[in-house]
């Protein structure tokens, strides 16, 4: 068993599921009594959500509805970074939320320290926005996956290309 096994650690958001969640949330917003006559809207612009509503209270309710729909669709809400609430045209307020795709340098360092702290015989290398972990023992790789899942990371990670 000289062949090395490996897997990749990635952080991705499925934009199709986000679009579906937005559509379902907007359908609910249009039928809810407390949003009747409201100028509430959720849109997706490239990798950024734009939430618009009449006031901050309704914006928070809009956000709660969206988060509920995202969770039901299996989209990680950890990968959404909300910006400041800013005034928009027509007496409304707007909030932008960035969808985080990929693992940045800081989070890659955190993940690497978690891997190193396990003391297992595995190698990890940062490749652009993902981390490749390789080792001879598949059991060691499984233990690394378990250690990363237990860690409290600021982003949601997925494990792909397990060979």
From Swiss-Prot:
Pfam families: DUF520. Gene3D superfamilies: 3.30.70.860, YajQ-like, domain 2. One of its GO terms (molecular function) is nucleotide binding. It comes from the Bacteria. GO terms for cellular component: cytosol. SUPFAM superfamilies: YajQ-like. InterPro entries: DUF520, UPF0234-like_C, UPF0234_N, YajQ-like_sf. Coiled coil: none annotated. Keywords: Nucleotide-binding. Nucleotide-binding protein. Belongs to the YajQ family. NCBIfam families: PRK05412.1. This is Nucleotide-binding protein GTNG_0630. It comes from Geobacillus thermodenitrificans (strain NG80-2).
């Amino acid at each position: 068993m000289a062949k090395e096994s490996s897997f990749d650690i990635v952080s991705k958001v499925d934009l199709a599921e986000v679009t579906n969640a937005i559509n379902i949330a907007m359908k609910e917003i249009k039928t809810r009594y407390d949003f009747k006559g409201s100028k509430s809207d959720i849109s997706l612009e490239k990798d950024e959500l734009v939430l618009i509503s009449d006031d901050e209270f309704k914006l928070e309710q809009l956000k709660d509805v969206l988060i509920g729909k995202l969770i039901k669709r299996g989209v990680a809400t950890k990968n959404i970074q909300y910006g400041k609430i800013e005034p928009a045209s027509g007496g409304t307020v707007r909030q932008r939320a960035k969808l985080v795709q990929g693992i940045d340098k800081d989070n890659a360092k955190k993940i690497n320290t978690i891997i190193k702290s396990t003391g297992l015989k595995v190698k990890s290398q940062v490749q652009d926005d993902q981390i490749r972990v390789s080792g001879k023992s598949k059991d060691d790789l499984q233990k690394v996956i378990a250690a990363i899942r237990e860690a409290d990371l600021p982003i949601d990670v997925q494990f792909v290309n397990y060979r």
